[in-house]
Amino acid sequence: MKEGIHPKYNEITVKCLCGNSFESRSTKAEISTEVCSQCHPFYTGKQKLMDTAGRVERFRKRYNIAAAPTEES
């Protein structure tokens, strides 16, 4: 490698919003992340439910669309 053209590569602590932290290497001084392997649903097996029903209702209200009739058996 050429001398003097590469950024300094430091050992840093990466901090997650869940409180977890781990060591890594980067050219940045510090890194903070919103999701890590300790809190991501894929790794934890816990699913976070999103409020999609509220979004659908807002869409229908905005465009004045009546709800589809439900099929009863």
Curated annotation (Swiss-Prot):
One of its GO terms (biological process) is translation. Keywords: Metal-binding, Ribonucleoprotein, Ribosomal protein, RNA-binding, rRNA-binding, Zinc. One of its GO terms (molecular function) is metal ion binding. Zn(2+) binds at residues 16, 18, 36, 39. One of its GO terms (cellular component) is ribosome. Transmembrane segments: none annotated. It holds the Pfam family Ribosomal_L31. It comes from the Bacteria. Binds 1 zinc ion per subunit. InterPro entries: Ribosomal_bL28/bL31-like_sf (IPR034704), Ribosomal_bL31 (IPR002150), Ribosomal_bL31_A (IPR027491), Ribosomal_bL31_sf (IPR042105). SUPFAM superfamilies: L28p-like (SSF143800). Belongs to the bacterial ribosomal protein bL31 family. Type A subfamily. Part of the 50S ribosomal subunit. PANTHER family: 50S RIBOSOMAL PROTEIN L31, CHLOROPLASTIC (PTHR33280), LARGE RIBOSOMAL SUBUNIT PROTEIN BL31A (PTHR33280:SF6). Binds the 23S rRNA. HAMAP family: Ribosomal_bL31_1. This is Large ribosomal subunit protein bL31. It comes from Citrifermentans bemidjiense (strain ATCC BAA-1014 / DSM 16622 / JCM 12645 / Bem). The gene is rpmE.
